[in-house]
C-alpha cells in the first residue's frame, strides 16, 4: 500500500532546514509567517534575544474579508507595527510554505508598506 507523506511534516522539515541558515537580530529581525487553514499570523522576531518585536494576525479586529484579503491586511499591519518599532529591514521567513497565494500576498503587502526584504 502506498502512503502519502504528511504535508505538515514535510513543511516543518523545510522550515527547520531554513532556520538553521537564517537568524534575526534586533537591527534586522526575522519576519516569520504561520498559515493555518483559517488564519494567518506574522511576527517580527529577534532571535538573538528570543523576543517578538511586533506581531499581527487575522484575529485582529480590523482584519476582515477573504483569506487572501486578510493576508494583505496582516502584511499592512506588520509593516506599520514594524515602522512604529523603528524596523525597516527584515529577513523573510516563509515558514516552509510555498511562496504563493496567502504567503505571497502578505509579503507583497509588507513590501509595499515599507518593509525591505
Curated annotation (Swiss-Prot):
One of its GO terms (cellular component) is cytosolic large ribosomal subunit. One of its GO terms (biological process) is translation. GO terms for molecular function: 5S rRNA binding; structural constituent of ribosome. Pfam families: Ribosomal_L18p. NCBIfam families: L18_bact (TIGR00060). This is one of the proteins that bind and probably mediate the attachment of the 5S RNA into the large ribosomal subunit, where it forms part of the central protuberance. This is Large ribosomal subunit protein uL18. It comes from Leuconostoc mesenteroides subsp. mesenteroides (strain ATCC 8293 / DSM 20343 / BCRC 11652 / CCM 1803 / JCM 6124 / NCDO 523 / NBRC 100496 / NCIMB 8023 / NCTC 12954 / NRRL B-1118 / 37Y). The gene is rplR.
